[in-house]
């Protein structure tokens, strides 16, 4: 991409607060964006070949939405935790295996999407994200849903297409959790904690494509209670 084209993009972004440059084969985060740290509210650099984010990413104090899906990121800099106004962070289709501890400082974050990365463990340190509504960890290699999931404020957690064979009982204590997606994992019927059915807020539990027939769920203790929540939610949105 030529300098003049980039310059035109930057000039437009200065006015709009939006910088979108997708599918251009970029191998580096555009350094010229440093000039717009005071302006930018939305950045989308999806479908490029960017391997790392610069430390100056932390200086975009007004950034609300950052999408950098389908690149080649293997890690994130600690400075990403400085984005105090960030509400949406989309990192799908990279090569991330873990998150920096500073991610827990993103106090405004509502959506964190990490689908299609290389996580083998459920990322830790997300319990401090008090505004988090949606956490997408689908298409990774996670095997266990650990007890610390109970610390999350998320309303929806998507764990479809992992390698999960174990789900903690504590998941029922996740205070705002309404939607739990566990499709296409390695779960036996006996691995589903009954407390999700009997004692949680979950009104949509999707478990298709595991090692049991979904209709066998009907025989589990607490299934009727779960169905009451499921039906009530459906009526609300009908």
From Swiss-Prot:
Organism: Danio rerio (Zebrafish)
Keyword vocabulary terms for this entry: Leucine-rich repeat, Repeat
LRR repeats: 10-36, 37-62, 64-82, 83-106, 108-128, 129-152, 154-173, 174-199
InterPro entries: Leu-rich_rpt, Leu-rich_rpt_typical-subtyp, LRR_dom_sf, LRR_domain-containing, LRR_R13L4/SHOC2-like
Taxonomic lineage: Eukaryota, Metazoa, Chordata, Craniata, Vertebrata
Name of the protein in question: Leucine-rich repeat-containing protein 57
Top-rank taxon: Eukaryota
UniProt-listed Pfam families: LRR_14
